[in-house]
From Swiss-Prot:
Organism of provenance: Malus domestica (Apple)
One of the record's GO molecular function terms: metal ion binding
One Pfam family linked to the record: Metallothio_2
Keywords: Metal-binding, Metal-thiolate cluster
Protein family (similarity comment): Belongs to the metallothionein superfamily. Type 15 family.
Name of the gene encoding the protein in the UniProt record: MT1
PANTHER family hit by this protein: METALLOTHIONEIN-LIKE PROTEIN 2A, METALLOTHIONEIN-LIKE PROTEIN 2B
Keyword Metal-binding: yes
Protein name according to UniProt: Metallothionein-like protein type 2
Protein function: Metallothioneins have a high content of cysteine residues that bind various heavy metals.
UniProt KW DNA repair keyword: no
Alphabetical list of InterPro entries matching this protein: Metalthion_15p
């Protein structure tokens, strides 16, 4: 997969991969907020889902925002 940041596209105001690399956000530049945030991964046993959620996909596509070549958004209309 040739998308940026291990498959996570960070679409900011300049439509490029940012330092956060948290995926395409629903609000502008929220994925680039700096601070002392902590991410917790909880693993357990649950029934298998029969569908894939967009937040779990390697290449996100929200509001027309998806990773293109060379760490850019294609098309560049992230909202």
């Amino acid at each position: 997969m040739s998308s940026c940041c291990g498959g996570k596209c960070g679409c900011g105001s300049v439509c490029s991969c940012g330092s956060g690399c948290n995926g395409c956000g629903m609000a502008p530049d929220l994925s680039y907020m700096e601070g002392s945030t902590t991410e917790t991964l909880v693993m357990g046993v649950a029934p298998q889902k029969s569908h894939m959620e967009a937040s779990e996909m390697g290449v996100a596509a929200e509001n027309g925002c998806k990773c293109g070549d060379n760490c850019t958004c294609n098309p560049c209309n992230c909202k």
